């Protein structure tokens, strides 16, 4: 019974957004409510008084952009919450996509001023593919933004998801007065810069109550009554199962920087968000209730602490109980491993954990045994499916500026690409090292980290490739011939899989047409190594 109750009390989720929508600020407020931190570090353009807890790498502090997925745990209302913060910047989208494989639900932050943006669309596409339950937080109501009904319509249309308002704002910008909680029938009045846990709530079970007019004024009270009547008529009651199936997204309004509207959402999240769920593996369906341990590595982070050459692998527990000092089976390496100092996280703050349950994320000190997608079990041979590697969009040759540092460069490239920061390719039949990334900022991060963590100085030369496609074929001879004739455009990824580097969409389509026996894949399952 204890095992089942441990599963039910856990919620593991990610916060996702377009850059600057307020994701990191919202993360800080959640940690405040959970008692994990005492002061929130507001992230403002290059004026950071206190570096945000979840932005713990030096390069993040310089840029004010979360570029590494942080893992934070806290307790709230008897529930253990595991929050995975993700890079908002589009150049680090693959890290975010991979993190979505480790969560059971998502909170999507939308800027009320800018509405749906490019990165939001891409992230929601992954959520739809995985049928991940989504809660929407419409942020920055204290600024003049889009009409609330227009914004709901835009989100539904652009993201192909049905919405269900759970709170409703009274005005916005300088006239923003608060939010009405449609579930609890209560009014929360807004005052800028109030204390984080201040609770200025008025219970209003009947909207015709005169206290509404006294609190808001006649005009705004009349508008709220009209809005709520319309919302009730259109949306009715939320069906929690429709939310958990990924069909309906509850919507909350607020201002994260002012800690407003956040508590209502957090309370609802605890109430309706799914606990850890079942998983698919290469051999069978795995029930979360199974008592034998299993889990997978979804992220590797080299060198969290510059003073120590740490390398930490992040493990998502999927079933059973993880125990410190117990031997577990590393499926890919076919060997047993144990961990004497597994950690849980509050960003940089680590604490040793003796056991962990489904939904928990555990940090494991790693000496190079792990790759993303690796599976640990109690002996059973399977791996978890649906952990993808995506085709990069920008390709550059790595040029070593100091031949004396060749070993350091090789080690750095292997470790950084093991983390999933970028993908490493080696030209077929040669030694040319090619880095593939989703965006330019990743190259800056790699260059910075190679120099500061490994002492290797590099420059990157641009290459004229459009996409990388993994090659497979049932006809080994045809594949061998293709590789021989197209060797200038063929490389191997770090796991030895063949990749075709297409110079344009036209070249790719031509090769597909001319080589019907060969399959060109835009994604690769990372477990194939």
For each feature predicted by the language model, list its residue ranges:
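Structural and coupling elements of P-loop NTPases
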Residues: 1-529
